[in-house]
Amino acid sequence: MADIKLIALDLDGTLLTTDKKLTDRTKATLKAAREQGVKVVLTTGRPLKAMDFFLKELGTDGHDDEYTITFNGGLVQKNTGEILDKTVFSIDDVTRIYEETEKLEIPLDAISEGTVYQIQSDQESLYAQFNPALTFVPTAFEDLSSQVTYNKCVTAFPQEPLDEAIQKISPELYDQYEIFKSRELLLEWSPKNVHKATGLSKLIEYLGIDRSKVMACGDEANDLSMIEWAGLGVAMQNAVPAVKAVANVVTPMTNDEEAVAWAIEKYVLKEN
């Protein structure tokens, strides 16, 4: 197996415990990997603004030679905020998605950088519960600006009615956009061909790292692309079946039992 040069980590359900904590053991293994010259790249659906706390915890915030992939691969950037690659929605894309969610009677939020435009609806969005650090702006659909670029859209709604609605999404939308669940209550809408693997592919090209030397860890449907793409794809024990099916390794423990620390100790850290 090739020496691992980059570790791509999903946050929720993977790196973090259920109560959104980084354990001391996990932080220690990440620090040890970085001291060996391995890049540790948080790879998430969140915007960078919602990552500040975790980057500080890792000691990589504001660093010119540290990187984060946000919006499920739609934004590749240095931890200084400098953008290396960006793919976004136009207002026409948001309009098409909004028409579908209105028909399905589910809410829609449109996200631009650290601002969440909560499109007014009869159905209440639950997204503020997931990312309270973001700025939430209640907005009538007709007031959405065509001058703003939108990184992604989200539908945060109770699981049972959300899953029922997903079954009714028009097939043509799957041809036009990336549509996937990232949590039980969260459906994400991204530009076509934007997923974590494409973001990582662009980053390793910039860094000159071969994908055979990438280890990717995840648990949900939005992690599947990078788990399948990476030289070493690691699924958490708590991962959805589709992710486990494409992984090279399934950890014997869950995210609450420090599965990422186990994987780094086993596959990355070398004896001095």
Regions picked out by a protein language model, each given a short descriptive name:
Residues 2-6, 23, 188-272:
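Mg2+-dependent phosphoryl-transfer enzymes with acidic/Ser/Thr/Gly-rich catalytic loops
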Residues 100, 104-217:
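Conserved acidic, metal-coordinating active-site core of Asp-based
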Residues 3-19:
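Asp-based phosphoryl-transfer active-site loop
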Residues 24-124:
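Active-site phosphate-binding/coordination module
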Residues 41, 69, 109, 180, ...:
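Structural detector of well-ordered beta-strand residues that form the stable sheet scaffold
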Residues 37-41, 65-66, 152, 212-213, ...:
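Short active-site oxyanion
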Residues 58, 64, 72, 173-175, ...:
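Short, structured coil segments at secondary-structure junctions
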Residues 33, 72, 153, 227, ...:
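Residue-level signal for inorganic ion chemistry
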